[in-house]
A protein has these predicted regions:
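FAD-binding subdomain of flavoenzyme oxidoreductases
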Residues: 104-258, 476-484
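A glycine- and small-aliphatic-rich helix-loop capping segment at beta-alpha/alpha-beta transitions
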Residues: 86-103, 131-135, 158-169, 216-222, ...
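N-terminal flexible segment immediately upstream of the FAD-binding catalytic core
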Residues: 1-67, 83-113, 264-274, 320-347, ...
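Alpha-helix capping/hinge segments and adjacent helical runs
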Residues: 24-25, 415-427, 451-452, 456-462
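C-terminal substrate-recognition/cap domain of FAD-linked oxidoreductases
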Residues: 30-39, 218-222, 228, 232-406, ...
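Activity-critical C-terminal alpha-helical subdomain
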Residues: 183, 433-484
Length: 484
C-alpha cells in the first residue's frame, strides 16, 4: 500500500506527524484505503471523506489532540462506534477523533448506584459490569452490543425500555467535557441536582457539536424482581395499535411495548436472528412488564385481556430467560435482518401521538405503494416513535430518487399528525432539511447562538443539527470541511 501514501497532501501529513507524537504512529490513519470504513456510519447512504483519523488511548491524549486541533483551527468529528443512523459522525475534510479506545469503567458505586465511565465504554458492557451488584444501565438502543456511552450522550439515545425508564438524559448525572477550544468543563453533579442553567441538558443530545466527553457519570437502575415478556400477534396493524392504546390508557406502564409489521417479521424470520415470530401475522406486539412479583400475575392477565379484546390471534408468554432473550433478539436485530432484503437501507425516526398510529401507518403504506418501494416498520409503539425502514439500491438513481421523495413525504405526514422528526437517532445530515418543518427561522437562529457559546468557531462536528443556510458555520468553515 506504499503508493497509497502519495495521495495524502503535505499539510495532512504534517498534521498526522503532530498527532502521531501524541498517540503513536499506529494511532493515526491517513491513507484513503485506511479511512474507507470511517466514511459513513450505520446509515451508509451518506459518505464523507475525513482527512485523518486519530485514536487516543487515554484522557490526556484526547485533551492534547483537541488542543492541537484548536491551535491549528482544524475542524473535527468525535466518533464512538459509528452505529448512528443519521449520518452524524462524519464530514468531509475533518480529523475524525475515534473514542472507542477510551473504554475504561472508572468506578461503580453500588450504594449510590452510580458509575463513572470513559466515552468509549460499550453500552452493554456497562450493564454486564453492574450485574454482580444487581444493577443495570437502563437505556438500551438496539445497537447496545456495539454503541458507546459517549455516542449515546451525543444522541440522547433511547431504546425499547425508555417509556418506563427514560432516555439517556434521565440517566446522566454529570459530564466532564473538553470544549473545542481546549477548555475543560464539568456539567452537572453526582447528586443529580440542578444548579443554575441546565447546561448538562444542553450538552446531552448536542450530537458532538458542543465538545467531547472525557468522562460520564451515569445512574444505574436496580434489576426488577420480576419480569414477564409477552408476544401477541394480530392480523392487522390497526388491531395492534388499538391494543397499544388500551394498555397505556389502563394505567399499566410497560417496561417496553414494541410493534413490528408483517414485512419486518418475515425479514427477521428469514435471517439468522429468527425468533419464532408468526410469519403470517400482519403485526406483533412485544410487551415487557416488570416490577414486584406480587402484582405481576394480575398485570399480565390484564394485558392479555386487552390484547384479546383488540383482536390478538395468539398470546405467548416467555417461559424462561432463554426464550425471553430469543424474542428480544429478533427485535434488536431487525435492522440487521433487513440487510438481506436490499443492499442499502435508510431508517427514519419520527415520533407521532399514539392515537394516530393506524392512520399514519396506513399513509406510509400508501406512500410505499405509490413510489414502488418496500417499507418495513419496527418501532416503539408505547411512545409512538416510528422507525420506517426503506430498502433500496443506491446504484439505481431512479430508485434512490423515489426513496428520497418517499422519506420527505413520510416526515411531512408525521409532522402533520402532530409529531416531530426524530425521537432518538438525532438530526445528523439525514434530517437537516426537515428542521424547518418544526422550527421557525428565529428558533434555528437561537440554536446557532447557543452552539456558538460552546464552539464559537463551529469546528466540532461541522454541518450538523442546524441547516447551514440558518447558520454562519457554512461560510466560516474551511473549504476542505465544506467539501468544496
Amino acid at each position: 500500500m506504499a503508493n497509497d501514501s502519495t495521495t495524502v497532501p503535505t499539510p495532512t501529513r504534517e498534521l498526522a506527524e503532530r498527532l502521531a507524537e501524541i498517540v503513536g504512529p499506529r494511532g493515526v490513519l491517513q491513507r484513503p484505503s485506511e479511512l474507507v470504513v470511517y466514511r459513513s456510519d450505520g446509515l451508509p447512504g451518506y459518505a464523507k471523506q475525513p482527512q485523518l483519523a486519530v485514536f487516543p488511548r487515554a484522557r490526556d491524549e484526547l485533551i492534547a489532540i483537541v488542543r492541537l486541533l484548536a491551535e491549528r483551527r482544524v475542524p473535527f468529528v468525535p466518533r464512538g462506534a459509528g452505529t448512528g443512523l443519521s449520518g452524524g459522525a462524519l464530514a468531509d475534510g475533518v480529523v475524525l477523533v475515534g473514542l472507542n479506545r477510551l473504554n475504561r469503567i472508572l468506578s461503580i458505586d453500588p450504594v449510590e448506584r452510580l458509575a463513572v465511565v470513559e466515552p468509549g465504554v460499550v453500552n452493554v458492557a456497562l450493564t454486564r459490569a453492574a450485574t454482580p451488584y444487581g444493577l443495570h444501565y437502563a437505556p438500551d438502543p438496539s445497537s447496545q452490543a456495539a454503541c458507546t456511552i459517549g455516542g449515546n450522550v451525543a444522541e440522547n439515545a433511547g431504546g425499547p425500555h425508555c417509556l418506563k425508564y427514560g432516555v439517556t438524559l434521565n440517566h446522566v448525572r454529570a459530564v466532564t467535557a473538553i470544549l473545542p477550544d481546549g477548555e475543560i468543563i464539568r456539567l452537572g453533579n453526582a447528586a443529580g441536582e440542578a444548579d443554575g442553567y441546565d447546561l448538562l441538558g444542553a450538552f446531552v443530545g448536542s450530537e458532538g457539536c458542543f465538545g467531547v466527553a472525557l468522562d460520564v457519570t451515569v445512574r444505574l437502575s436496580p434489576n426488577p424482581p420480576a419480569v414477564r415478556t409477552l408476544l401477541a400477534d394480530f392480523m392487522s396493524i390497526g388491531a395492534a395499535a388499538r391494543a397499544t392504546s388500551a394498555i397505556i390508557a389502563s394505567g399499566i406502564v410497560p417496561a417496553a411495548l414494541e410493534m413490528m409489521d408483517g414485512a419486518t417479521i418475515r425479514a427477521v424470520e428469514a435471517s439468522i436472528y429468527a425468533a419464532g415470530y408468526p410469519v403470517d401475522a400482519e403485526a406483533i406486539l412485544l410487551i415487557e412488564l416488570d416490577g414486584l412479583a406480587a402484582g405481576m400475575d394480575a398485570d399480565t392477565a390484564r394485558v392479555e385481556a386487552m390484547c384479546q379484546e383488540a383482536g390478538a390471534r395468539t398470546i405467548r408468554i416467555a417461559r424462561d430467560e432463554a426464550e425471553r432473550a430469543r424474542l428480544w433478539q429478533g427485535r434488536k436485530k431487525a435492522f440487521g435482518a433487513m440487510g438481506r432484503v436490499s443492499p442499502h437501507l435508510v431508517v427514519q425516526d419520527a415520533v407521532i401521538p399514539r392515537t394516530r398510529l393506524p392512520e399514519v401507518l396506513a399513509s406510509i403504506r400508501e406512500i410505499a405503494t405509490r413510489h414502488g418501494i418496500t417499507i418495513c416498520n419496527v418501532f416503539h409503539a408505547d411512545d409512538g416513535n416510528l422507525h420506517p425502514n426503506i430498502g433500496y439500491d443506491a446504484n439505481d438513481p431512479d430508485e434512490q430518487a423515489r426513496v428520497q421523495t418517499a422519506m420527505r413525504e413520510i416526515m411531512a405526514t408525521c409532522v402533520a399528525a402532530g409529531g416531530t422528526i426524530t425521537g432518538e437517532h438525532g438530526i445528523g445530515l439525514d434530517k437537516l432539511d426537515y428542521m424547518p418543518l418544526i422550527f421557525s427561522d428565529e428558533s434555528l437562529a437561537a440554536m446557532c447562538r447557543l452552539r456558538e457559546v460552546f464552539d464559537p468557531d463551529r469546528r466540532s462536528n461541522p454541518g450538523k443539527v442546524i441547516p447551514i443556510h440558518s447558520c454562519r458555520e457554512w461560510h466560516a468553515a474551511p473549504k476542505a470541511a465544506r467539501g468544496v
